[in-house]
Swiss-Prot record:
Name this polypeptide is given: Putative ankyrin repeat protein R840
ANK repeats: from-to residues: 78-107, 108-137, 139-167, 169-197, 198-227, 229-255, 256-285, 286-315, 317-345, 346-375, 376-405, 406-435, 437-467, 468-497, 499-526
Keyword flag GTP-binding: no
Lineage of the organism: Viruses, Varidnaviria, Bamfordvirae, Nucleocytoviricota, Megaviricetes
Stored Pfam families: Ank (PF00023), Ank_2 (PF12796)
InterPro entries, sorted: Ankyrin_rpt, Ankyrin_rpt-contain_sf, SecEffector_AnkRepeat
Organism: Acanthamoeba polyphaga mimivirus
Length: 526
């Protein structure tokens, strides 16, 4: 029965009977308690749901020291914070109520009106202005944020009340332009933004985000708007209609050695590239950077178009195929090879960096086309081990890479960089770590990492922890790896090796727990 009554009637009954605890028998109110476990603030929820009568009764219950509403979840917001939430939500009746209870509309540098302007609540803005809020605080932030968010009626109101639209380096028109609010831009110009002043920054911001109408309007307002940064930004972001418009108004499409076509190519904007070519841009400027950038970023259609227009894919020692390989763009790599690119230029750069970056498909393709995987002392394998690319490692080894190169350097690299899976694979290919004179355990202890799992694995398969004058415990101690130090000692490491190097370095680096442990095991700190 209780739930059939609207909250307003129910609260009036409670007021008449003066029995406030009955309020909690109505589910419209009582359901608020279900929010406690979700960490939603009760008062914020009341404001959000516009239950002003409930808010008033909560306050009445607080006044009467009611046990339930004295709990923390009813009391963790200040009056000013309640005001801010109301302004953000546009609950003008709540705003008035909290102000009547003592909330300060000018607190936190007039934060209330900033929230109302940001979220477009004009009635709240009007009320706050009528009650003395400072609309010009923080360099007229209120009008700036209203411009930024496109709230035109609020912008008009604030201007009519004296807001300075040119404050903060003309930020209002910049933000409006950046976000494409053409009508606000027009108002700002009509209200005092000097049409002979520098329009370039608002134009560039509008260009960047593709707001053609704003660009057209601003350019029409100033003969000084000739900054060629605008057309570069349009080309960079692929806004073809803006590129065409700016070109028609005299912007230099060939600025900075045809940078426009280079950046458009690099970002994959084919239609922009075609337009710029039709207007005379040189696709081969800066030693064919256009096709190189397109290849680097994997834009196959742009690469194909540029090649059809005469771009040289072999410029700068086949940089196009090298960069495409390095970044894993297999289709671009295949196309460039089909057009005569040399994959082996600069000491097989392509396969070395494809391996380093883990691009297995590219590596497999390059090898199928004759790339030398043994180049530079098995550099592809070493790079793959360094970065932890197990698939590439397996492929290279299966294709003839030498896991014993440079005194087992692949194993050292894997151990020293924490790549346990690669280390296990390399060992499985016929390496007996118990007989090789390589300090694998010591390498795993180096630097700030300390790869305990690798240390345990190596010891479990017979690696010598005492190699290189007990390098393992010396480094583990120096870098503060207490768990590794204990494990090594338990497995026979000499804590006094190299004239007590371990404890001296642990002490010097401030690893007191390691020092204490080593002392307990017989080390001497002199």
């Amino acid at each position: 029965m209780y739930d059939n009554l609207p909250p307003e009637i129910w609260t009036n009954i409670i007021s008449y009977t003066n029995e406030f605890n009955l309020l909690f028998t109505n589910s419209n109110f009582f359901s608020l308690f279900n929010l406690i476990n979700t960490k939603i603030n009760i008062i914020e929820h009341v404001i959000k749901r516009e239950h002003l009568s409930v808010q008033k009764y909560i306050d009445q219950l607080k006044k009467n020291c009611n046990e339930i509403v004295s709990k923390k979840f009813f009391n963790d917001l200040t009056l000013n914070e309640c005001l801010f939430i109301s302004c953000k939500r546009g609950r003008n009746d709540f705003v008035k109520y909290f102000v009547s209870k003592g909330a300060n509309i000018r607190s936190r540098d007039n934060f209330a009106i900033k929230l109302a302007c940001e979220h477009g609540h004009i009635e709240v803005v009007k009320y706050l202005i009528d009650n003395g809020v400072d609309i010009r605080s923080e360099k007229n932030y209120a009008v700036r944020i209203a411009c930024n968010n496109g709230h035109i009626d609020i912008v008009k109101l604030l201007i009519s009340k004296g807001a300075n639209i040119r404050d903060y380096d003309n930020c209002a028109i910049k933000w409006a332009s950046e976000n494409g609010h053409i009508e606000i831009v027009k108002i700002l110009v009509s209200q005092g933004y000097d049409s002979t002043s520098n329009f370039n920054e608002p134009v560039i911001l509008a260009v960047k985000n593709g707001h053609l109408e704003v660009v057209k309007y601003l350019v029409s307002q100033s003969d000084r708007c000739r900054n060629n940064s605008a057309i570069i930004s349009a080309a960079e972001n692929g806004h073809i209609e803006i590129v065409k418009f700016l070109a028609s108004r005299g912007s230099n499409i060939r600025i900075d050695d045809d940078y426009t076509i280079r950046i458009a190519s690099g970002n994959g904007h084919l239609e922009v590239v075609k337009f710029l070519v039709s207007k005379g841009c040189n696709i081969r400027s800066e030693i064919d950077h256009a096709v190189q950038w397109a290849s680097t970023n994997g834009h196959l259609e742009v690469v194909e178009y540029l090649v059809s227009q005469g771009a040289d894919i072999k410029s700068e020692y086949d940089r196009s195929v090298r960069c495409a390989s390095q970044n894993g763009h297999i289709e671009v790599v295949k196309y460039l090879v089909s057009q005569g690119a040399n994959i082996r230029n600069i000491n097989d750069y392509a396969v070395r960096y494809a391996s380093e970056n883990g691009h297995i498909e590219v590596v497999e393709y390059l090898v199928s086309q004759g790339a030398n995987i043994r180049v530079d002392n098995d550099s592809p394998l070493l790079r793959a081990c360094l970065k932890g690319h197990i698939k590439v490692v397996k492929f290279l080894v299966s294709s003839g890479a030498d896991i014993r190169v440079n005194n087992y350097q692949p194993l050292l690299i894997a151990a020293g960089n924490g790549h346990l899976e690669i280390l296990k694979y390399l060992v499985s290919q016929g390496v007996n770590v118990s007989i090789i004179n390589v300090p694998l355990v010591g390498i795993a202890c180096i630097d700030g990492y300390g790869y305990f799992e690798i240390v345990k694995y190596l010891v479990s398969i017979g690696a010598d922890i005492n190699l290189a004058d007990d390098m393992a415990i010396r480094l583990a101690s120096e870098y503060g790896h207490l768990d590794i130090v204990k494990y090594l000692v338990e497995n026979g490491a000499n804590v006094r090796a190299e004239n007590d190097y371990a404890i001296k370095q642990a002490h010097r680096k401030g690893h007191q727990e390691v020092v204490n442990y080593l002392l307990s095991k017989g080390a001497i700190l002199s």
